[in-house]
Amino acid sequence: MRILVTGSAGFIGRNLVEWLRNSGDPNDMEIMEFTLDTPESLLDEYCRDCDFVFHLAGVNRPKNEAEFTAGNVDLTTRLLRALRSGSQAPVLMTSSTQAALDNAYGRSKRAAEQALFEYSLDTQAPVYAYRLPGVFGKWSQPNYNSVVATFCHNIARDIEITVNDPAAPITLVYIDDVVREFISVMLGTVGEMDEDGCYSVQVTHSTTVGAIAELLHGFRAIRQTLEVPRMDDPFTKKLYSTYLSYLPTDGFSYPLDMRSDARGSFTEIIRTADRGQFSVNVTKPGITKGQHWHQTKNEKFVVVSGTGVIRFRKVGGDEVIEYPVSGGHIEVVDIPPGYTHNIENVGNDDLITFMWGNECFDPDNPDTYPLDV
């Protein structure tokens, strides 16, 4: 299949091209990219050979309003003229929800839609005009036309953002949802068109500008609080992925509070509101740690390096239960409430244990009681 993508160097185009390259057999797909740097003479050649067209090229932030016509209407007309005398391939074109508005940008997108519909009438080729709201995700240019991209870029760098109206509503679509739907259309799965003959991405997110800013500031604070966001909320999950893509390249890592002594170290890694706490514990050779029990708190220990023994004794009982553990045989050992327990390094190297607790450590209510096994 030969696919023409106009605007392939743009935000949506880059994501679409990478999805196409990584879906299916690359030997069964040829992607022809048309950008601002592509000689216009190649457009006729591409339009003769293509089986499907993603027309993503357009203008939304021109220096003057005349560029709306040149970038949105004239280019579309030029493309469709080449397709008429070429392969007459199906076309999916990105439009905007602003096409319903009476402004220069909206009028130019509406005119491009009309040209697309006329092409379909003339050639019987299927066409799909997608009216998109704000699109967010990786690779969107900050300080251009996306509030999400700008907020992510600035907050990741501790640059102040401006929120004029926190309650201002905003509807967004996520880039991966957009690209998935576009590819599905190319492969024959098409949704319902609206009364204007246009299509909308099915998965949308309605929120406010203030809510976005609050979430992003919370993401920034994770490096101090260790409290990761709720990933069961689709919008939060997508926004967090987007935020991380805007981190400066010298800012991917951040330090943790490594509590060290002669016995080894203990370091909290992640805290969650509803899934407990994740930590890493290092125990030096010959050292025993623990010697305590919990009323309700419970844990899971996973030794990933070294050799050790985890011992248990039910509070009030005499029997000692032993579980040999090592990094050569990774397994989970549950630490139930009501059992005093310890972990001893019986090897010659550091014993490294990944630990999960069902609750975050609270120094005011530790639920931890000293008692030797």
Give short role names for the model-derived ranges:
Residues S184, G188-M258:
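Mid/C-terminal beta-alpha module of Rossmann-like enzyme folds, strongest
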Residues P142-T150, A167-L187, G210, E214:
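Substrate-positioning beta->alpha
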